[in-house]
Amino acid sequence: HLLDTRRRRAAFADLDGDGDLDMLTTNKIDPEDNATSRMFYFENTGTKTHPVFHQRSHIPLFENYHYAPTLGDLDGDGDLDMLVGTWNKGIGFFRNQGTRSKPNFVLDENGWITLTRGSNSAPTLQDIDHDGDLDLFVGESSGELNFYRNVGTTKNPSFELVSDRFADIDVGRRSFPTFADINADGKYELFIGSETGKILMYREENSKEEVSFKHDPAFSLSLNNYATPSLVDINADGKLDVISGSISGGLIFYYGR
């Protein structure tokens, strides 16, 4: 099934509790309703090693454009909550009022996260300071990166802006960040998609006092324009795969070897 995602990211997680990865994906502007974007839930009806995605429903959100979802347990109750980036409204926080296998995402009106610069927010969650709670990184239209440290707890997150030009990162236009530990050393690699389709990689060089990343020029990967990468092991073969939206529509899968 080819979906007009155009520039938006897919998010992967086990959303029905059956042990394989399901998918949320969005479009830039919904062709059936030009007043908003739309988010779709695709269930993996295949297996962990041979995924087959079928569209089951769309997830109702607020009206805006350029939805960009990311998932994580933000309130410590064992199920997945959701942050959704937008064109011009910042980032919405959706608490899962359902369960791990039957999620019900409800907007927390007091949980909005606003940007100090840029638009087209593209959030991703990672415990980057290794303190047990999820921190927030946000790509945006200028091509730079916003870092919000979680100064709350695993049950009550509170995101405090550390820098809206984190590590002087600038990919040109339309930064889309995601994390992975590609060499299993306990440190994260930061991958950032861009408007040109080039994906840059930065390696974690944290100290006890500071979160820090350094660009690795040896890594090179170019996709279609407006790359929105996610790195997951989609077929459970122990190797990370890259899934990206693009300006031409649809999702592009690159399997790790």
Predicted regions and their residues:
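Blade-level signature of beta-propeller repeat domains, shared across WD40, Kelch, NHL, RCC1
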Residues: A227-R257
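Loop/turn-rich, solvent-exposed surfaces of beta-rich toroidal or solenoidal domains
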Residues: T178-F179, Y188, I192-I199
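Short loop/turn segments that connect beta-strands within the blades of beta-propeller domains
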Residues: R6, A35-S37, T86-W87, E140-S141, ...
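Blade-edge motifs of beta-propeller repeat domains
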Residues: H1-T5, E43-N64, R95-G118, R149-G172, ...
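Hydrophobic beta-strand segments that make up the repeating blades of beta-propeller
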Residues: M23-N27, M82-T86, L136-E140, L190-S194, ...
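Glycine-aliphatic tripeptides that mark coil-to-beta-strand junctions in extracellular
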Residues: G19-T25, G78-L80, G132-L134, G186-Y188, ...
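Beta-propeller blade termini
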Residues: R8-G17, T26, Y67-G76, S121-H130, ...
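Short glycine/acidic-enriched loop and turn motifs that connect beta-strands
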Residues: K28-E32, K89-G90, G143-E144, G197-K198, ...
